[in-house]
Amino acid sequence: LASSAASDVYKRQAEHWKGQTGQGVEVIQSHGGSGKQALEVANGNEADVVTLALEYDVKAIQDAGLIEDGWINEFDKDSSPYTSTIVFLVRKGNPKNIKDWGDLVKDGVGVITPNPKTSGGARWNYLAAWAYADKLYNGDETQIEAFIKKLYENVLVLDSGARGATTSFVENNQGDVLIAWENEAFLSVQENPDEYEIVTPSISILAQPSVAVVDDVVDQRGTRDVATEYLSYLYSDEAQRIAGDNFYRPSNPDILNEYADTFDLNINLVTIQDFGGWDEVQKKHFDDGGVFDRIYELSLIHISEPTRRTPI
């Protein structure tokens, strides 16, 4: 969850826990790129619970021996209490007339998106763009890769996480379009309604953040009960509405329908299973030497102004 939503949930859950047990709860939060956060936890930065951008990042902590097998079935909806999707945030009036993914590869369009090597949200961005190109070119991977390469040639800043990318676009005034989590885009418009607007592409992806108890840590600290209760609380009607109020899509379909005036519920969404699941996606696209590395290296070669690109 973004920090604003997380703080609200933690406060409500702490009140709920104290009412049930009489115990107070102190919550220490860490926010950043999902892949980077997962690596830090796997390398010993203790966390009782994780809420990460994608299943694969939780599996990285599992592979380090800190989360037990079967975590994805511990909570409802494959341990995904809320979802999101990928949209475009553009400047007010949409001066570059950006309407779909195809507009992001046009000359003169500056794109902001995070680095999929470090950001879970950026992987969703990449896959949503791939889904568009896959449909456009009827699965011809040579043409799909050429499309993705052109898109990354237009990327001005490759931040390590989604929040950093938003900062580059909003605060640093870089780029014409931010490929963004839907919730981040809505928050930017809410905070600056006269400066930005949202464009929903013709096709996107169902982004499913994952939550898990870090078993090794909670067993050592004796915090399993409160950690499990916190993640269970995310599925309560109250927490689902907090998620919706912060522009995440509640996993409870009845509560999601309460936000029909906020979200485009008819958007064409592919899922990670359309790509064969995260293991296959990671190996093909994001592992060292994968498709993204090849495309990004080629896109760097074709940049005429080296100072345009600022990988972070």
Residue ranges and their predicted role:
Residues 14-22, 42-46, 55, 62-66, ...:
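Sec-exported extracytoplasmic/periplasmic mature domains
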Residues 93-99, 118, 131-139, 217-225:
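Short helix-loop capping/hinge motifs at secondary-structure junctions, enriched
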Residues 3-4, 90-92, 109-137, 152-155, ...:
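Short beta-strand->loop
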Residues 3-118:
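N-terminal segment of the mature folded domain
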Residues 136-202:
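Ligand-binding pocket segment of bilobal, Venus flytrap-like solute-binding proteins
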Residues 80-85, 145-152, 158-160, 191-224, ...:
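Periplasmic-binding protein-like
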Residues 218-300, 304:
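Extracellular/periplasmic juxtamembrane helices and adjacent flexible linkers that interface
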Residues 1-10, 305-307, 312:
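Short, small-residue-biased leader/transition segments that mark boundaries at the very start
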